[in-house]
From Swiss-Prot:
Gene3D superfamilies: 2.160.20.70, 3.30.160.540. Interacts with MinD and FtsZ. Belongs to the MinC family. The keyword Cell division applies. The keyword Cell cycle applies. This is Probable septum site-determining protein MinC. It comes from Geobacillus thermodenitrificans (strain NG80-2). Cell division inhibitor that blocks the formation of polar Z ring septums. Rapidly oscillates between the poles of the cell to destabilize FtsZ filaments that have formed before they mature into polar Z rings. Prevents FtsZ polymerization. The lineage of its organism: Bacteria, Bacillati, Bacillota, Bacilli, Bacillales.
């Protein structure tokens, strides 16, 4: 009895089209060969048939941009199939570095003086002051163990869940995501208590005691535990 050939492609129909589960242990060439055999050569669909979306799940296989394009082109040859998404469990080195930069906590010990700009991709922990005219910008949260008397912009890429915290909160301007507070409408005093700025349910920046943060942002725990 002839041994049954192992299949590297599993096809499942969904309400959104077709999902192809591609084996991540076989060679790339064997994978392409089976896709061509099952989807292209056996295709008998009329040229005017409606397009069907195809979602590829490639598991732990990394595909280069050129290989992704080759896959899309091969499947498109079956007349009515078009690749809508390619999902992989792995990322490239460049993507990994970018992810780390955006999620890491960057600790800086310095004074940001007038005219200076300190910019980080992830969360910022500043051990020092931000003087009037100085600016700190972060892709994530900003924590200042010192006085904030200049400009602070957290979540600059649009993250409205970001917060700004400082030992002394007397900023010239606060920005979180695309929300800006030019003239803070809150009063500060000389209490030795950290304060934090966040966006409330009315899409406005408000400042309150840092202790309230555990209720406002329960998932924000990485830096608070260190301060």
């Amino acid at each position: 009895m002839a041994k049954q050939k192992q299949q590297y492609v599993t096809i499942k129909g969904t309400k959104d089209g077709l999902t192809l589960y591609l084996d991540d242990r076989c060679s790339y060439d064997d994978l392409m060969k089976e896709i061509e055999e099952r989807l292209v050569k056996r295709s008998s669909v009329a040229a005017n048939s409606p397009l069907v979306s195809v979602h590829l799940k490639v598991g732990n296989r990394y595909l280069t941009p050129a290989q992704e394009e080759e896959l899309r082109a091969l499947i498109r040859r079956s007349k009515n199939l078009v690749v809508d998404s390619i999902e992989s469990n792995v990322i490239s080195k460049a993507e990994a570095i970018e992810w780390v930069q955006k999620t890491e906590i960057v600790t800086v010990s310095r004074i940001v003086r007038s005219g200076q700009v300190l910019h980080v991709e992830g969360d910022l922990l500043l051990l020092g002051d931000v003087n009037p005219g100085g600016t700190v910008i972060a892709g994530g949260n900003i924590f200042i163990l010192g006085a904030l008397r200049g400009i602070a912009h957290a979540g600059y890429a649009g993250n409205k869940e970001a917060i700004i915290a400082a030992s002394v909160m007397k900023p010239m301007q606060l920005r979180i995501g695309d929300v800006m507070n030019r003239a803070p409408d809150y009063k500060t005093d000389e209490r030795n208590e950290m304060e934090c700025a966040y966006i409330n349910e009315h899409n406005q920046i408000v400042v309150d005691r840092l202790q309230l943060l555990m209720h406002l942002r329960p998932n924000l725990t990485r830096l608070e535990r260190r301060m």
